[in-house]
Amino acid sequence: MRLKPSFRWSIYAAFAVLFLTGAGWLVADWQKESSIGETWQQTAAYLLMVHGGAAMATLLLLGALIPLHALRAWRAAQNRISGSVMATFNAVLIVTAFGLYYLGSETLRPWMSWIHIAAGCLLALWFPVHIVLGRRKLR
């Protein structure tokens, strides 16, 4: 199911901002013990704020994507496996983001963090696959 260009590019932009700020935060977090750790810590804080804001916008886009794209494609039996993988990665990211933000458990936090990072990286790899598979089936 092809999306209107403005909506499609909004989704691409939102996912790009999420991936870049998430990856940037990861680098900044790893560097906070360095000699200029304070700079990295401040950078990590700013990146996390942008990441959270982009996540809010992405949630709105995903909410619109369900009836406009996912449900229509599902009913037409198009790209079901690839779309299900996309939905699963997004659901894992939403649940783990909620856990990271709202759960105070120091036992669960490292697990949530690593699952969130892994799901984000895997989604970034799978997203272009989903697009290519969908376009091949439209031809």
What are these regions (language model features)?
Residues 1-139:
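Membrane-embedded alpha-helical bundles that constitute the cytochrome b-like, heme-associated redox core
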